[in-house]
Swiss-Prot record:
Keywords: Cell cycle, Cell division, Cell shape, Cell wall biogenesis/degradation, Cytoplasm, Peptidoglycan synthesis, Pyruvate, Transferase. SUPFAM superfamilies: EPT/RTPC-like. The active site is at C115. One of its GO terms (biological process) is cell wall organization. PANTHER family: UDP-N-ACETYLGLUCOSAMINE 1-CARBOXYVINYLTRANSFERASE (PTHR43783:SF1). It comes from the Bacteria. Belongs to the EPSP synthase family. MurA subfamily. It is found in: Cytoplasm. It comes from Methylacidiphilum infernorum (isolate V4) (Methylokorus infernorum (strain V4)). This is UDP-N-acetylglucosamine 1-carboxyvinyltransferase.
Amino acid sequence: MEKFIIKGGNPLEGKITISGSKNSALPILAATLLTPEECVIHRVPNLSDIRYMLEILKFLGAQVHYEKGTVRIKSKIVHSTAPYDLVRKMRASICILGPLIARCGQARVSLPGGCVIGDRPIDLHITGLQKLGADIEIIKGDVVAHGGILRGTSINLKGKYGSTVLGTDNVMMAACQAEGTTIIEGAACEPEVEDLAHFLSSMGAKISGMGTQQLIIEGVKELHGCEYTIITDRIEAGTFAVAAAMTKGNLLLEHAPVEHMGSVLEKLKDCGASIEIESQGIRVSRSGPLRAFEIVTAAYPGFPTDMQAQFCAMATVAEGTSKIVENIFPNRFMHISELKRLGAMIELSQNQALIHGTERLSGAPVMASDLRASAALVLAGLVAENTTEVHRVYHIDRGYEKIDEKLSSVGANITRVYSKI
C-alpha cells in the first residue's frame, strides 16, 4: 500500500487542469456494450476505477485500447457473466447489467463493491429493469437476469433518499433498445446522467427530457459506434476549489465545469472565498478569514453529497460553528473520527455534524476510509501544522487523477511513499 506524507502550511498558487468526470466515464464505458461497433471516448481519467471497468469489459469480450485519455472500445461480447473477483472493487460495475440484458438477453453480475458509506441498495435498478420485462433474481450474491423481449413502460425511480443516479443510468441504457416508449419518472438530474444520455444519443438513441426528472426514451432496433468527449469532473474541481480557499491560495481551475458547480461555488463565496469566472475556467482565492457555514446535501442541483467531506474539512479551520446535514447517505461521516485526530472539534448526531472551527490543526497519522473521506484528510493535511500521514490512499486513486502531482505543481508539500499499513 501507499500513503501521502503532507507538510502543511503552503498556499496553493498556479493552475490545475481538471480531468474528465469519473462518474460520467464509468456508465459511458458500460454503454459501449450496447453496440458491436467501435466507440472512441476522449477525456477518460486515468483512475483505478476506470481501469477496473476496462478489465470487466475486456473479460466480457471487448477489445480495449486506452492511451493518453482516449479509450477505443469494440464490444464483441463472449460472456454475459461478470464474476465477483472483477466487480467487487467498485459500485459502478452494476452499470453493465442494463446493457448486458439489452444486448444479450441475459446477464449474471455479482453484487458490487466500492466505498463503504452506508446503505446503497440496488433495489431500484432491479425494479426498473423488471418493469421493462427482465426476469431478475438474486442467487448466491449474484444478480441473475433473463431479458427476453424488453418493452417500454412507465417507471418511477424515486427512492427514500432521492433519485438513484446509477439506477437511472441502468434503466436508461436498457430502455434504448426496448420495444416502444419508456418514460422514467423521478429520474436523476445529475450532469453525469445527462452526459450519458448525450452519449447514447450519439450512438443513435432517441432520448428527450435530458437533465430533467422525466426521461422519455423511444426504443430503437440497434445502436452504432460514435466518438465522444466526456464532461470535466465537478467534484474534482470543487475539491481543488476548497483547497485554494483553505490554504489562502490562488488557483485557476482550467476547464472546470462552472455550469455544474453552482451550489458549491455559492457556498464557497459565503465562506469568504473569491470566485472569478475566466475564459480558461474558474479562479478561486481567499484573502480574508474563512467563515462558518451551513450545508444540507441534496440531489442535483442541490449541494452534492460528494463534496460534504471536503467542506467538513474546511469547517474545521473556519471561524465559528458550521453545521452539515447529510440527507443522501446519512452514515457518510467516517472522516470525522480521523479529522479529530488532527485536532478538529466535531459533534456528530445521526445525520448532522456540528464543526467548531479551531485556529490550527496538528499533523498526525490518519486512515482513509473511502474516496471523498480521503480527499478531506488530504485537505486537512494541507493546512495542519507539522506532518500529516494519510494511509490507504488507494481510496483517493479511485476518483482523483494524480492528485499528489497536481497539488505538488501548485506548491503543496506532498509525497507518495510505500506504507506497510
